[in-house]
Regions:
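Family-specific signature for flavin-dependent thymidylate synthase
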Residues: 1-112
């Protein structure tokens, strides 16, 4: 038996400036303003999209995050369907090696 800690890691390399440029390119299609793209225009354009409530354009970007958490937490994340998910199966457990269990996070009970 192997006890592991809950954790997370961002699997996608992130370049904020490039992300903003790709979102701007997609968003300017909606406003027929592709000709107004400059080296410096992405940040203010994306801010404008958010202020106008045009958040669907932000969905043109994605990142991959790996969460190691207990099944209860993963089911809560998945049921709200905020993204696309791939989840480790409990069906294909390898019993010939160490079985991994996630150490549950318990808040400081003295505070309650």
């Amino acid at each position: 038996m192997k006890i592991i800690e809950a954790s997370h890691s961002i699997e996608t390399p992130i370049d904020g400036a490039e992300i903003l440029k790709r979102i701007e390119k997609a968003g300017r299609t909606c406003y027929k303003s592709e000709d107004r793209i400059t080296e410096e225009s992405a940040k203010s354009f994306v801010r404008m999209l958010i202020e106008r409530g045009h958040e669907s354009v932000l969905e043109h970007e994605s990142i991959t995050v790996r969460f190691i958490c207990d099944r209860g937490i993963s089911h809560e994340i998945v049921r709200h369907r905020l993204a696309s998910y791939s989840q480790e199966s409990q069906r294909y457990v390898r019993y010939n090696g160490d079985i991994e269990f996630i150490n549950p996070h318990m808040p400081n009970t003295k505070a309650y």
